[in-house]
Amino acid sequence: MLVWALTTEFVEVVGIGLIGRIDALEVGGRSLAFWGLGQVGVAIKGPTGVLYVDPYLTDSDGEGGSLPRTFPPPLLPAEVSNASSVLLTHAHIDHTDPDTVLPLSEASPESSFVAPFTSRDTLVEAGLDEGRIVVPEVGEPLEVSGPTVTAVPSAHTELEYDPERGYPYLGYVIEWNGVTVYHAGDTVVYDGMVETLSAWDIDLAFVPINGRDFFRTRRNIIGNTDFRETAELTEILDIGLIVPTHYDLIEGNTSDPGHFVSHLYATNPMRPHKLLRPGELLLFVREADR
């Protein structure tokens, strides 16, 4: 049985109070706290430390680029002074953004970065000390300042593998304080994905719903699972609470989360879900073993 609670504070002004709110919250047993950062980004706090996943806190691809933001970042990179570790899933700029990572690394000088080789190359070229970057072995648990993190392959949109360097796209299973979290990064469902993830009883998962189509692919917007696939994956894996991602931030690559909620309800009206807004807190509490 699971119990989860949430607040609904929304940060409407850039950076106002969010770091202070993260720092002030105390996390008890069998619990984790999550704050949405937009796109797939999330800050996760356990009893000790704060883990960030794919923080994209600038408009790097909108300023002169083709993918402007639909809302400002809830934090500025230089404000992130509490990061113990940062997980990066792949090298696309809305997931591995040097203009976010470098100021963040200076504001959190003890932080480490877990990333696939593609993201590592991007960050080393941008000037990040390569000694702070860990390229994980897929399937091998890694201790990172509190949680245990296991990298799993993601397919965006094909399952790619370099025999010398590994997988360019990763997801992560995070085990921390009695709670198991799956963060997919960007992915589609691929052969073997369900079998890989079935090794864990996943309490909470972050999975994209923006889908893919011919016209976005032609504009070099690479797709992900759509709302139907994510709902069905949630049921197959019996995920305790599903948080859809990758539907809100980038102009021309948004998706109506209401379609996901409707399809999930049609699939299983008892399945817990949460639309996590930027700056909003989700406090997840595991009452007992599943």
Name these PLM-found stretches.
Residues 7-29, 115-179, 263-288:
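Metallo-beta-lactamase
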Residues 44, 54, 90, 97, ...:
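Divalent metal-coordination and catalytic microenvironments
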Residues 49-51, 84-85, 147, 179-181, ...:
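Structural motif
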Residues 60, 92-96, 120-123, 140-143, ...:
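Active-site environment of divalent metal-dependent phosphoester hydrolases
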Residues 74-142:
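Active-site HxH/HxHxD metal-binding segment of metal-dependent hydrolases
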Residues 48-88, 98-106, 159, 189-199:
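Pre-active-site segment of Zn-dependent metallo-hydrolases
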Residues 112, 118, 188-278:
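Cap/insert and terminal regions of metallo-dependent hydrolase folds
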Residues 1-52, 57-61, 66-67, 236:
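Zn-dependent metallo-beta-lactamase
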